[in-house]
Amino acid sequence: MARIPKTLKFVVVIVAVLLPVLAYSATTARQEEVPQQTVAPQQQRHSFKGEECPAGSHRSEHTGACNPCTEGVDYTNASNNEPSCFPCTVCKSDQKHKSSCTMTRDTVCQCKEGTFRNENSPEMCRKCSRCPSGEVQVSNCTSWDDIQCVEEFGANATVETPAAEETMNTSPGTPAPAAEETMNTSPGTPAPAAEETMTTSPGTPAPAAEETMTTSPGTPAPAAEETMITSPGTPASSHYLSCTIVGIIVLIVLLIVFV
């Protein structure tokens, strides 16, 4: 039986030792590349954070460009980064069209004559009311408010506004209505309280203003977004270098043993 040369044994041992080292090093290198690939989309997603598209347009999710809205179909009325424009409002059957929808303004609708809509009925137009018996109308019905009525005093009552003074025609022999009271304050009589004015004197703490987050020198700034990028000299790269050095040492030992 032929004897296996020492050189062949030496080559087999070297291959058996270096293959696991190279395989492990390749796996470590692939793991180092993964964080770099995940950071790229995150940076692209925040690249338009400080920019906004003008009114009448929106931000495209695919290209990041500002796409214009369609006249009469959708709109945006302020700077934005919306993925799409807002659809124009369509006036209901109980409303009339006041102004059309543009790229920067929605449709304006209002209730038809004889109807109104206010805070109590924002979803629909209601029919204007009529003053009940014993009351007179002081304001007309509009598209945004119902009529206003007040009680009627006497047959010849004259009403100017809801808060107006009442004028009554008196016939001879009828006691005249009491005259308006005039509040004249004599010395020593406390005057009616005037409107309260908030005036701060020196030493009085002023009302708290809006809180402004300002960092002074030496104050840690808010944490920024983490970017996982490994540079040469990080633990992963050092590990790869250590594996290579170990393989070289093993190779030298084998040379000393078999040669």
Curated annotation (Swiss-Prot):
Receptor for the cytotoxic ligand TRAIL. Lacks a cytoplasmic death domain and hence is not capable of inducing apoptosis. May protect cells against TRAIL mediated apoptosis by competing with TRAIL-R1 and R2 for binding to the ligand. Residues 30-45 have a biased composition (Polar residues). Keywords: Apoptosis, Cell membrane, Disulfide bond, Glycoprotein, GPI-anchor, Lipoprotein, Membrane, Receptor, Repeat, Signal. It comes from the Eukaryota. The gene is TNFRSF10C. It is a lipid-anchor; GPI-anchor. Higher expression in normal tissues than in tumor cell lines. Highly expressed in peripheral blood lymphocytes, spleen, skeletal muscle, placenta, lung and heart. Glycans are attached at N77, N140, N156. Disulfide bonds join C53-C66, C69-C85, C88-C101, C91-C109, C111-C125, C128-C141, C131-C149. InterPro entries: TNFR/NGFR_Cys_rich_reg, TNFR_10, TNFRSF10, TNFRSF10_N. Residues 30-56, 160-224 are annotated as: Disordered. It is found in: Cell membrane. A lipid is attached at A236 (GPI-anchor amidated alanine). The lineage of its organism: Eukaryota, Metazoa, Chordata, Craniata, Vertebrata. Residues 1-25 form the signal peptide. Gene3D superfamilies: Tumor Necrosis Factor Receptor, subunit A, domain 2. TAPE repeats lie at residues 162-176, 177-191, 192-206, 207-221, 222-236. Residues 185-217 have a biased composition (Low complexity). Its main location: membrane. One of its GO terms (cellular component) is cell surface. This is Tumor necrosis factor receptor superfamily member 10C. N-glycosylated and O-glycosylated. It holds the Pfam family TNFR_c6. GO terms for biological process: positive regulation of apoptotic process; TRAIL-activated apoptotic signaling pathway. Residues 237-259 form a propeptide.
